[in-house]
């Protein structure tokens, strides 16, 4: 039996990954992390979606220690969330240092216990948001370290790594879940479901991608299929 664990926030990217994983694996588990994030409403959204979409199990892990250690606008209400995209070589104040190191490591431990062969994460380098822990180089390096440390080949999969946000919308549409992803996920840094606040960097990236996809569906869908190998 093929099993996978999805690092699941209830946002656009991880929900799209979950939708795809449910088509590709016999058993899919979700892991969500509570680190005292500003947009904590995502945890309830993740619970609802994991149940609705049919995940085998959904585990919410308390990692509030991360909140104490990592200072970010996502962990401190006193730091405002930016409503712009960072410079290409800058790291935005929404970056939570060590977050993906911790999340992927804990997800791999869970995968080890449930005998899953893969950990799936929705990180993406194409729409680079200034997060060093979303890079392909980082994921591969951590994957190697985790596999060595556990003496087990647990594969880190990044299905969105080389597609942009418009193509991520196309992927959701390919599986017939565009409306669900648009209306029932939470990507907004300010914790507003669906189209969000419309002002933060996460909402801007999401909206721009959706508008691009809706304006030229055939072209974007074709590009997504070419990059992902889907027919």
Swiss-Prot record:
<feature type="binding site">
    <location>
        <begin position="8"/>
        <end position="18"/>
    </location>
    <ligand>
        <name>ATP</name>
    </ligand>
</feature>
<comment type="pathway">
    <text>Purine metabolism; 7-cyano-7-deazaguanine biosynthesis.</text>
</comment>
<dbReference type="GO" id="GO:0016879">
    <property type="term" value="F:ligase activity, forming carbon-nitrogen bonds"/>
</dbReference>
<keyword id="KW-0436">Ligase</keyword>
<dbReference type="GO" id="GO:0008616">
    <property type="term" value="P:queuosine biosynthetic process"/>
</dbReference>
<feature type="binding site">
    <location>
        <position position="203"/>
    </location>
    <ligand>
        <name>Zn(2+)</name>
    </ligand>
</feature>
<feature type="binding site">
    <location>
        <position position="200"/>
    </location>
    <ligand>
        <name>Zn(2+)</name>
    </ligand>
</feature>
<keyword id="KW-0479">Metal-binding</keyword>
<dbReference type="GO" id="GO:0005524">
    <property type="term" value="F:ATP binding"/>
</dbReference>
<keyword id="KW-0067">ATP-binding</keyword>
<keyword id="KW-0547">Nucleotide-binding</keyword>
<feature type="binding site">
    <location>
        <position position="188"/>
    </location>
    <ligand>
        <name>Zn(2+)</name>
    </ligand>
</feature>
<keyword id="KW-0862">Zinc</keyword>
<comment type="function">
    <text>Catalyzes the ATP-dependent conversion of 7-carboxy-7-deazaguanine (CDG) to 7-cyano-7-deazaguanine (preQ(0)).</text>
</comment>
<feature type="binding site">
    <location>
        <position position="197"/>
    </location>
    <ligand>
        <name>Zn(2+)</name>
    </ligand>
</feature>
<dbReference type="InterPro" id="IPR018317">
    <property type="entry name" value="QueC"/>
</dbReference>
<dbReference type="InterPro" id="IPR014729">
    <property type="entry name" value="Rossmann-like_a/b/a_fold"/>
</dbReference>
<comment type="similarity">
    <text>Belongs to the QueC family.</text>
</comment>
<dbReference type="GO" id="GO:0008270">
    <property type="term" value="F:zinc ion binding"/>
</dbReference>
<protein>
    <recommendedName>
        <fullName>7-cyano-7-deazaguanine synthase</fullName>
        <ecNumber>6.3.4.20</ecNumber>
    </recommendedName>
</protein>
<dbReference type="Pfam" id="PF06508">
    <property type="entry name" value="QueC"/>
</dbReference>
<keyword id="KW-0671">Queuosine biosynthesis</keyword>
């Amino acid at each position: 039996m093929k099993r996978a664990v999805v690092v699941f926030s209830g946002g656009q990217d991880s929900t799209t990954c979950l939708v795809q994983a449910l088509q590709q694996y016999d058993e899919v588990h979700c892991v969500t992390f509570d680190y005292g994030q500003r947009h904590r409403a995502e945890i309830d959204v993740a619970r609802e979606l994991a149940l609705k979409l049919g995940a085998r199990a959904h585990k919410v892990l308390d990692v509030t220690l991360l909140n104490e250690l990592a200072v970010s606008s996502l962990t401190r209400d006193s730091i405002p969330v930016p409503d712009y995209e960072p410079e290409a070589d800058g790291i935005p104040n929404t970056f939570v240092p060590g977050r993906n190191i911790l999340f992927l490591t804990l997800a791999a431990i869970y995968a080890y216990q449930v005998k899953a062969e893969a950990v799936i994460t929705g990180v993406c380098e194409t729409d680079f948001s200034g997060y060093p822990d979303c890079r392909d180089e980082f994921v591969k390096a951590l994957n190697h370290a985790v596999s060595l440390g556990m003496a087990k080949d647990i594969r880190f999969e990044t299905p969105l790594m080389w597609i942009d946000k418009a193509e991520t919308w196309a992927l959701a549409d390919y599986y017939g879940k565009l409306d669900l992803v648009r209306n029932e996920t939470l990507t907004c840094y300010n914790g507003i479901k669906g189209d969000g606040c419309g002002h933060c960097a996460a909402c801007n990236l999401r909206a721009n991608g959706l508008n691009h996809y809706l304006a030229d569906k055939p072209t974007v869908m074709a590009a997504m299929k070419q990059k992902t190998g889907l027919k």
